[in-house]
A protein has these predicted regions:
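Cation-handling catalytic/transport regions enriched in His/Asp/Glu
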Residues: 1-191
Length: 191
């Protein structure tokens, strides 16, 4: 598999990086260009942190009955700690409150696309835990390998794309492009 990715996928990812280099108008991409996709700036969410959560509620309500119930439970039980505040620890992750069989999401919304990534990626992890928490086989919910866990979170990122304008307005397609390029760049690294 690694040889196949090296032979076919790495050249594809290299072409994608070259197009990004040209779009940015730089001579070469360096490590500090890794998170930059557009010369005029990467897309940022159009709403407040509370509006981002409410857009997430709308998206998950329309996505499926199961995701609606999941997200409403997360909101109603206050299982998001995502608003920035003084002296709050950095980072973003999903964990569990196993005594209650519920997921919990911690992050620091800061007005970047990462805020929306919490609503898609971390909620992908959280939804997986939500649907499997009562499964008696611990490997199905608590002891996932990283590769397995990332299937749920990265898939949810793509499932969310039809609703991305809720978060980015007219910059929705810029976000889609940035997200796809980021996902493509991850394949050689993640393999």
């Amino acid at each position: 598999l690694r040889e196949q990715i090296k032979k076919t996928f790495v050249p594809f990812a290299s072409q994608m990086h070259e197009r990004r280099r040209e779009r940015l108008g730089v001579d070469s991409l360096t490590y500090y260009d890794a998170g930059v996709y557009f010369k005029q700036g990467d897309p940022a969410p159009t709403g407040t942190p509370q509006e981002i959560l409410e857009s997430g509620r709308k998206m998950y309500s329309e996505m499926s009955e199961e995701t609606r119930d999941f997200f409403n439970m997360m909101m109603d039980w206050e299982l998001f700690d995502v608003f920035g505040r003084k002296n709050k620890a950095t980072g973003g992750y999903m964990t569990e409150i196993s005594d209650y069989g519920v997921p919990f999401i911690f992050a620091n919304f800061n007005g970047t696309s990462g805020d929306v990534d919490v609503i898609t990626h971390e909620c992908g992890h959280a939804f997986q835990y939500y649907v499997s928490a009562k499964d008696p086989i611990p490997e199905h919910n608590r002891y996932l390998t990283m590769e397995t866990a990332e299937i749920h979170s990265m898939s949810m990122e793509f499932f969310a794309e039809p609703w991305i304008e809720l978060f980015f307005g007219e910059k929705g397609n810029d976000y889609r492009q940035m997200h796809l390029e980021d996902a493509i760049a991850f394949v050689p690294y993640g393999t």
